[in-house]
């Protein structure tokens, strides 16, 4: 049996797995829990961890996430259940977030762990015309997340390093040594500091924009309890392609919005 695709690759087989139309059983489940007929289905581009489709039922748009990758039960068991609990919890966070509609956590009806949630208007912005406004819009979200009252123990799991099938450098990296050093650091001690509610995967690809304003924050399956610097640091890494000045500006704006220091 061949190894599953590298966690940072999207080869042809993975792309087909994630983008293909959901099976009839999954769409029948949607119809049964919503009480209407599926009118349209479209794959949503983005992450590599699951198959995500925009589904229209009786004129209402909703998002169907199916954890179809075969390595998911090993890399992150219980992820669908955790996402469902996170979506319930973020209802109290004062930012637009998806609303949980239904779950098939064991995949009894749909074949794989499945979540149905509300759709949020907006689109991901990777080429902002106003860089400072773009950064400010993101940094203003973080204090609202981190200031949420902590849930009861066990509702949201503590921060941990991502687990996956392989930590080997992907074939496209030009600096495998730097990659391996980054993996070592990521698996080191958890940063110190006051623990708060975290998005855990906070970066531009999960922030939706509409008419120049933030319209939503999506992908809550990695939500955790840990130091605020985890969300800040994760986003900093994802901003490196814009240059270190942008990374530093993001950090400064977050410090201004939160009243905290990034160490």
Outline where the language-model segments fall.
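An alpha-helical support segment within catalytic cores of ATP-dependent transferases
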Residues: 21-37, 108, 143-200, 210-212
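Active-site acidic catalytic loop and adjacent metal/ATP-binding pocket
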Residues: 45, 49-56, 63-64, 100, ...
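Short, surface-exposed acidic
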Residues: 34-41, 259-263
């Amino acid at each position: 049996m061949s190894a599953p695709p590298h966690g940072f690759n999207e080869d042809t087989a993975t792309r087909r797995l994630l983008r293909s139309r959901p099976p009839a059983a999954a769409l029948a489940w949607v119809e049964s829990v919503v009480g209407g007929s599926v009118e349209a289905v479209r794959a949503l581009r983005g992450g590599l961890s699951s198959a995500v489709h925009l589904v229209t039922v009786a004129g209402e748009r909703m998002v169907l996430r199916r954890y179809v990758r075969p390595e998911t039960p090993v890399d992150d068991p219980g992820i669908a259940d955790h996402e469902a609990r996170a979506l319930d919890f973020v209802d109290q966070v004062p930012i637009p977030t998806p609303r949980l509609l239904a779950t098939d956590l064991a995949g009894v009806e749909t074949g794989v762990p499945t979540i149905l949630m509300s759709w949020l208007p907006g689109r991901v912005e990777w080429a902002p015309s106003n860089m400072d406004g773009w950064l400010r819009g993101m940094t203003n979200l973080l204090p609202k997340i981190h200031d949420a009252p902590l849930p009861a123990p066990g509702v949201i799991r503590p921060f941990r390093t991502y687990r996956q099938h392989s930590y080997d450098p992907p074939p496209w990296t030009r600096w495998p040594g730097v990659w391996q050093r980054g993996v070592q650091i990521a698996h080191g001690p958890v940063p110190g500091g006051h623990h708060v509610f975290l998005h855990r995967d906070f970066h531009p690809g999960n922030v939706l924009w509409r008419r120049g304003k933030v319209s939503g924050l999506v992908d809550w399956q990695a939500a955790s309890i840990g130091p605020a610097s985890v969300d800040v640091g994760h986003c900093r890494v994802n901003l490196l392609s814009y240059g270190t000045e942008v990374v530093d500006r993001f950090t400064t704006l977050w410090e201004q919005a939160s009243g905290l220091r990034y160490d």
